[in-house]
Amino acid sequence: MALSLTAINLPPPPLRDNLLSSQFQFRPNLLKFPKIPSSSSSFNGISLKTVTPNNNNNNPFACHVSTSQFGVQETNKSYAEAVAVGKHIRMSADKARRVIDTIRGRPYEETLMILELMPYRACETILKIVFSAGANASNNLGLSKSSLVISKAEVNEGRTMKRTRPRAQGRANRILKRTCHITITVKGLPAESVVEASSS
């Protein structure tokens, strides 16, 4: 028994774009945001800015940018630096860097509290250097300790003392006694400026 097959020509299915009417088609335009000029302070790289919407402009993304009073005062102030250096400290540079990286950029009083609580042997030595830097700033430059900030904290490798340890069968192992140099720089305002700012 033979079967006869007939080909049926069906129209192609309509495209998806044709199903939607022109009133429902939406092609968003690229949004252009306004450029906001910003400036940073020479002391800590942070400026306080206030952004408020601009109701007078038809652009919904337009806004007013104004620098706060603290940011303006901070830019105009002149800061002085005091340095304390500890050389040939019997400690590897890597062990000192993990503490130095924690206190860099922090206020002086907060740094003292952190060093007293951290459970590392390097904290005791670094605490003495920070105390020395604070004393140099207060006594030599007349800076207020409440305004001091750890602006720079560096650790460099020092001289390495080589020793030997006797081992079995006439051999010897090398012992490396490493040292490092620690530099702490604090930056702050004179005591007179702090008193004038607090009184005003």
Swiss-Prot record:
GO annotation, biological process: translation
Note: In legumes L22 is not encoded in the chloroplast but by a nuclear gene.
HAMAP family in alphabetical order: Ribosomal_uL22_B
Compartments in which it is found: Plastid, Chloroplast
UniProt entry keywords in alphabetical sequence: Chloroplast, Plastid, Ribonucleoprotein, Ribosomal protein, RNA-binding, rRNA-binding, Transit peptide
Repeat among keywords: no
An MF annotation (GO) of this entry: rRNA binding
Gene symbol of the encoding locus: rpl22
Pfam families linked to this entry: Ribosomal_L22
The protein's assembly and partners: Part of the 50S ribosomal subunit.
InterPro entries: Ribosomal_uL22 (IPR001063), Ribosomal_uL22_bac/chlpt-type (IPR005727), Ribosomal_uL22_bac/org-type (IPR047867), Ribosomal_uL22_CS (IPR018260), Ribosomal_uL22_sf (IPR036394)
NCBIfam families associated with the record: rplV_bact
GO cellular component: chloroplast; large ribosomal subunit
Keyword Chloroplast annotated: yes
Name this protein carries in UniProt: Large ribosomal subunit protein uL22c
Family named by the database record: Belongs to the universal ribosomal protein uL22 family.
Function summary: This protein binds specifically to 23S rRNA. The globular domain of the protein is located near the polypeptide exit tunnel on the outside of the subunit, while an extended beta-hairpin is found that lines the wall of the exit tunnel in the center of the 70S ribosome.
